[in-house]
């Protein structure tokens, strides 16, 4: 259920945006005692994560929290470009240095610095990301040096310190400099720490493209290194890269693209937004002005910010557009990295849109527990992963600092509760593989310790709780601390670019200092709440749609020339009507057609209105069909000893039987193998499966028949395991089990489908432990799930915590039983099946650093070996474009740009904040 969409129009193109309901509620203030309790809770969570890294992973780069071991590059299966952050230099330890001081753990900080000095080697024969190494390692060393000299000067320790971290930072800076050896001055995306660039042994240097954020997020760290050491070459190179990006902006829109050729300066990806691929470029322009005092950085930022608010911002949404056609949106989904932007707007002083976007993001979090990697404009999951990103916590902290509104303390409390409830595991905190099912990924990125706990601790801290004045520092994109005093220390010899022309802007909108908060808030404590109120139901959309121009047309008695429900792509008369309304059809390579409207191509303004109404009807019809035909994935959670809910398998749903989404308790019981294993005839071991969940093998009969047979024998649920040996949700679309063409109302038990790899997890557990109990549910339940015998209780003190950890499986057992789970199917603009549309499309895999599995769920009905598969209409333009050639098609420019949509996340990890 939800609010129907209402329309928004810009000349030349039309699209739909979401309506917002005016309904809100108040909140209670957080007391000082509660803040202290929450602050202590953050410290305990940090100790849990950091302690497990040091105990189980150090000196490895990162902790694998599910298997309780370190992630060492080359010893684990490659995850693609995400592994380029790992350089065998104890990444997590370096990234955490200044966090230790912020959290007042100075003794642990001294120990960590000594370990970095004695143990870390930066001269490894390994190819790393220039961007990630800069923000995480160079930034971590500089942040550690900054707080080390502060502690030494204040007499709070570190008296032995003699700039060792700075010397290491300088060594690393020189190792990164060869990356800038391009005709443009933009850095190569990767470099070999030992051999540099373009040597045979370097194994890198052939790349031609980089993301805007990758090239434009160097100035803070490199300038700080120059100011600390007096060596100007670092700041000069970073400044040259920024100058080049500024010069290559699209002059009419003042926007930059996502990906650029490092040799020619041509834009490879011409879409623009504030999320993945661009985000920290904007951030570093403004922060470079704050740190270095160079007015040109502020002028550039203001020019870009004006373009962002003019074209990209559609409060509370931030939608990507095309740099050469900024009135045309590039996609209908948003990525999670844009969550940093409200915090940047606070630094800019533009509070209202920051509050609006932050509230929208919070509503998404309240629905899914975490912010999915990407979500659509109607707030459905687009990519379901959540690698414990800190951007939303960052913006929450800055909004609280700007407004003092206790509401943001409640938001922070929600983040703490969700992390403990859904991400905490015995060996740290695990990334969420799928926010819908709660399944985990064996991953705890270094930025989780570098940023998340820093922002949460500061959110609940009073000034007296900190051992230094945090206002004397600026945060890098990785939340490392650089002192503002650097603006007067060893200024770079780089000359200011005096030839650059800046766009004339309204001075009233871009004061040289942040706007006066008294003017913004007018002493009104309800200011922020009044902005949030209209957005309270932005996700839970249960309000009526406001009358619109289209409603007036439909109520005027005028008969529309064509209704969406009547449209047939093979009807030439219908196609002629669409052409008159400015609606064109694009035939996709998988046999489907996609509708696009250009209002300026309509025969008249009335025809354009008819076309807009038709497009709205088609979107609503498509959405209705998706809801009817597609079910979200379900979860099979092993809850018996020694698993206790920590192994979650993503399962395909059935279109019949118990609806697990309406039965929150799910179905829990021991599992037993049915005989015959196919489940296609009367069950011969009825006593063995009575009151249990029956395991069956796919094939030989319809799914509904299997369900009826085990239900008749007394089973309380059923799991069908794929008979295709080696199949996995990693490599195959997730099935929906359909009925047999007859009424399935007689089936009342829940039925789920597992691929062979996931099913073998349960079968192996039965062989090992005999009695295996599972929970069938719509999503994974809390990891502190109590077993029937009550072995496991919530952790309330250290002794209970230790007792609990003793009950969990050993790392070896976890390693054997760990699996990878399926991703979310994208949702996008309406597409209608043509008369010759195939029943399904090919699966196209993506690199592992992105939400890699953009498969479409298919409905399975028939028997093995080749089951009949019913495929609902595809609903993702992005997945469609994945199947197209990589070359730009000589078609409408919008189609040429659409093919790039799915590539946006290929740079996701490279612009991590």
From Swiss-Prot:
Signal peptide: 1-15
Compositional bias (Low complexity): 826-839
Record-annotated active site: 132 (proton donor), 279, 373 (proton donor), 391
Domain PA, first and last residues per copy: 660-766
InterPro entries: 6hp_glycosidase-like_sf, EDEM1/2/3, EDEM3_PA, Glyco_hydro_47, PA_dom_sf, PA_domain, Seven-hairpin_glycosidases
Pathway(s) per entry: Protein modification; protein glycosylation
BP GO annotations: carbohydrate metabolic process; endoplasmic reticulum mannose trimming; endoplasmic reticulum unfolded protein response; mannoprotein catabolic process; protein glycosylation; ubiquitin-dependent glycoprotein ERAD pathway
Biased composition (Basic and acidic residues): 843-866
Pfam families listed in its UniProt record: Glyco_hydro_47 (PF01532), PA (PF02225)
Intervals of motif Prevents secretion from ER: 910-913
Annotated segments matching region Disordered: 823-895
Function (record text): May be involved in endoplasmic reticulum-associated degradation (ERAD).
Domain comment quoted from the record: Contains a protease-associated domain (PA) of unknown function.
Family the entry assigns: Belongs to the glycosyl hydrolase 47 family.
PANTHER family: ER DEGRADATION-ENHANCING ALPHA-MANNOSIDASE-LIKE PROTEIN 2 (PTHR45679), ER DEGRADATION-ENHANCING ALPHA-MANNOSIDASE-LIKE PROTEIN 3 (PTHR45679:SF2)
Protein name in UniProt: ER degradation-enhancing alpha-mannosidase-like protein 3
């Amino acid at each position: 259920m939800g609010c129907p969409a209402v329309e928004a129009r810009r000349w030349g193109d039309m699209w739909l945006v979401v309506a917002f309901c005016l309904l809100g509620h108040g909140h209670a203030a957080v007391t000082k005692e509660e803040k202290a309790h929450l602050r202590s809770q953050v410290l305990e969570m940090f100790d849990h994560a950091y302690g497990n890294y040091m105990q189980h992973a150090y000196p490895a780069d990162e902790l694998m929290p599910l298997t309780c071991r370190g992630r060492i590059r080359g010893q684990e299966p490659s995850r693609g470009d995400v592994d380029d952050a790992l350089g065998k230099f104890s990444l997590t330890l370096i990234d955490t240095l200044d966090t230790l001081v912020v959290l007042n753990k100075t003794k642990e900080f001294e120990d960590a610095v000594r370990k970095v000095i004695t143990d870390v080697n930066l001269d490894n024969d390994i190819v790393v990301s220039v961007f990630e190494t800069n923000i995480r390692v160079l930034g971590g060393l500089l942040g550690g040096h900054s707080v080390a000299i502060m502690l030494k000067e204040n007499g709070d320790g570190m008296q032995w310190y003699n700039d060792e971290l700075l010397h290491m930072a300088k060594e690393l800076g020189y190792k990164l400099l060869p990356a800038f050896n391009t005709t443009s001055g933009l850095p190569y995306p990767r470099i070999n720490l030992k051999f540099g660039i373009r040597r045979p042994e370097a194994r890198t240097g052939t790349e031609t493209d980089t993301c805007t954020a990758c090239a434009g997020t160097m100035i803070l760290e490199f300038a700080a290194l120059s100011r600390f050491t007096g060596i100007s070459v670092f700041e000069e190179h970073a400044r040259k890269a920024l100058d080049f990006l500024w010069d290559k902006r699209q002059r009419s829109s003042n926007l930059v693209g996502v990906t650029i050729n490092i040799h020619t300066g041509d834009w490879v990806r011409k879409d623009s937004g504030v999320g993945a691929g661009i985000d920290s470029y904007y951030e570093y322009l403004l922060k470079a002005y704050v740190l270095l005092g160079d007015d040109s950085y502020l002028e550039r930022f203001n020019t870009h910010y004006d373009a962002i608010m003019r074209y990209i911002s559609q409060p509370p949404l931030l939608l990507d557009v095309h740099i050469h056609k900024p009135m045309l949106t590039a996609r209908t989904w948003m990525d999670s990295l844009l969550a940093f932007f409200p915090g940047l707007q606070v630094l800019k002083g533009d509070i209202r849109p920051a509050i609006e976007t932050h509230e929208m993001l919070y509503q998404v979090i309240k629905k899914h527990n975490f912010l999915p990697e990407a979500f659509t404009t109607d707030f459905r999951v687009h990519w379901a992963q959540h690698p414990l990103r800190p951007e939303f916590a960052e913006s929450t902290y800055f909004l609280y600092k700007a407004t003092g509104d206790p509401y943001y303390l409640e938001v922070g409390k929600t983040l703490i509760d969700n992390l403990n409830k859904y991400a905490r595991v015995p060996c740290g905190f695990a990334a969420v593989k799928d926010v819908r099912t709660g399944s985990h990924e064996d991953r705890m990125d270094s930025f989780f310790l570098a940023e998340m706990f820093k922002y949460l601790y500061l959110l609940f801290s009073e000034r007296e709780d900190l051992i230094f004045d945090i206002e004397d520092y600026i945060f890098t994109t990785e939340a490392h601390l650089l002192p503002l005093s650097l603006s007067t220390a060893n200024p770079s010899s780089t000359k200011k670019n005096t030839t650059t022309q800046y766009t004339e802007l309204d001075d009233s909108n871009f004061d040289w200092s942040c706007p006066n908060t008294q003017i913004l808030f007018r002493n009104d404590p309800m200011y922020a709440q009044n902005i949030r109120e209209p957005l309270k139901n932005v996700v839970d959309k249960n309000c009526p749609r406001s009358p619109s121009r289209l409603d007036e047309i439909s109520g005027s008695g005028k008969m529309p020339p064509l209704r969406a429900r009547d449209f047939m792509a093979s009807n030439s008369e219908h196609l002629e009507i669409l052409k008159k309304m400015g609606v064109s059809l694009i035939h996709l390579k998988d046999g489907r057609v996609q509708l696009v409207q250009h209002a300026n191509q309509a025969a008249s303004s009335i025809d354009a209105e008819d076309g807009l109404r038709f497009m709205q009807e088609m979107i609503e019809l498509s959405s209705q069909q998706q809801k009817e035909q597609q079910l979200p994935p379900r979860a099979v959670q092993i809850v018996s000893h020694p698993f206790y809910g920590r192994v979650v398998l993503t399962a395909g749903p059935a279109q019949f039987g118990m609806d697990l989404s309406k039965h929150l308790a799910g179905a829990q019981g021991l599992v037993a193998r049915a005989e015959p294993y196919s489940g296609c005839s009367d069950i011969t071991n009825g006593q063995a499966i009575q009151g249990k969940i029956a395991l069956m093998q796919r094939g030989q009969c319809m799914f509904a028949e299997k369900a009826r047979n085990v239900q008749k024998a007394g089973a309380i649920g059923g799991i069908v395991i794929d008979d295709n040996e080696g199949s996995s949700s990693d490599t195959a679309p997730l099935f929906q089990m359909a009925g047999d063409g007859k009424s399935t109302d007689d089936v009342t038990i829940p039925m789920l489908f597992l691929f062979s790899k996931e099913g073998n997890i349960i079968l192996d557990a039965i062989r090992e432990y005999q009695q295996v109990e599972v929970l069938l549910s719509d999503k994974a339940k809390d990891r502190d799930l109590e077993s029937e015998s009550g072995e496991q209780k919530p952790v309330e003190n250290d002794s209970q915590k230790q007792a609990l950890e003793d009950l969990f499986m050993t790392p070896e057992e976890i390693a054997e039983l760990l699996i990878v789970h399926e991703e979310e199917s994208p949702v996008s603009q309406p597409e209608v099946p043509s008369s010759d549309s195939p029943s399904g499309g090919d699966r196209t895999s993506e690199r592992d650093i992105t939400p890699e599995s953009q498969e479409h769920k298919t409905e399975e009905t028939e028997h093995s070996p080749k089951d009949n598969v019913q495929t609902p209409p595809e609903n993702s333009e992005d997945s469609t474009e994945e199947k197209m050639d990589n070359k730009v098609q000589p078609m409408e420019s919008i189609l040429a740009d659409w093919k790039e949509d799915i590539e946006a996340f290929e740079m996701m990890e490279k612009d991590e904040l």
